[in-house]
Amino acid sequence: RDDVESRGLGDVYKRQIEAPLVGFCVRSRLGTMFPLLDGGRTANLKFEQTGVKFATPTVNKINAFGEEDDVAGRMLMIERLGGILKYNDVADKVFRSNLCMIDLHFPRMLGEMLRVMHLDGISKVSDLTEAIKQINPLKIKDELIHKHSYYEYKMKQFLMALALGMRPAKIFNGIDSAISGFLFVNGNGEVLCYQKADRQVFADFLFVNSRFEKSSTEKDKYGYLERENGVYYFKLNLKIGLLKR
């Protein structure tokens, strides 16, 4: 009997060793809400300043405008002076490749969403996606936009990838991490469970309950005109969190 019991325990132990480690992320509206994406300067997107060629004194004047966090004010000043901010690239090559795993043109879509967030004050992902459908930065056909819900689909893919382990500075190959889902504590203290096994429900939850957030311009080095190889660029930072209410 002892031999049988020890053998049984050994079998259980072996299975536990071989089984993948899985777990749930906990997010609570009753406490500190950790973001889905907080990549720091790795998550910066670059816009090339075109149109009028600014002299150095003008650039200095633009960069000195407003408070540190008045990114929209500096963007509007560039426009008033005849400049154009045109999406150029993702600042970090690993994050660029990660975003391209969602879609080769997805970085451009995110860039336009960031522009709208700062200039129009829209932060909810669902509202930003609706705005992007009207702008159609990828110039896709109406059938893709409305019948196939292209922009919503791509955004949900991205949010799911973030929730299940994508990070800006780590190479993403489409394979989910050990995270099985979210345990979400709402404002009433109720615990809701969203599992990756039910991807559609999980994706819909993330889409409706996520927002773009503004990080520190000083810490993440964005929101100013910067010169690189004779060209001026203006960076915007991508940070995504869950709604706090």
Model-derived features with residue positions:
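Generic recognition of cysteine residues
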Residues: 12-13, 25, 100, 193
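Extended, amphipathic alpha-helical scaffolds
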Residues: 146-245
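Conserved catalytic cores of phosphodiester-cleaving nucleases, focusing on short active-site segments
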Residues: 7, 22-28
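Acidic, metal/cofactor-coordinating or nucleic-acid-engaging core segments within structured domains
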Residues: 18-19, 29-185
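Single conserved hydrophobic/aromatic residue that forms the stacking wall/gate
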Residues: 2-9, 13
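Compact beta-rich and alpha/beta scaffold cores in large eukaryotic transport/transcription complexes
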Residues: 16, 26-28, 36-64, 210-245
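Generic ordered-secondary-structure signal
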Residues: 2, 21-24, 45-46
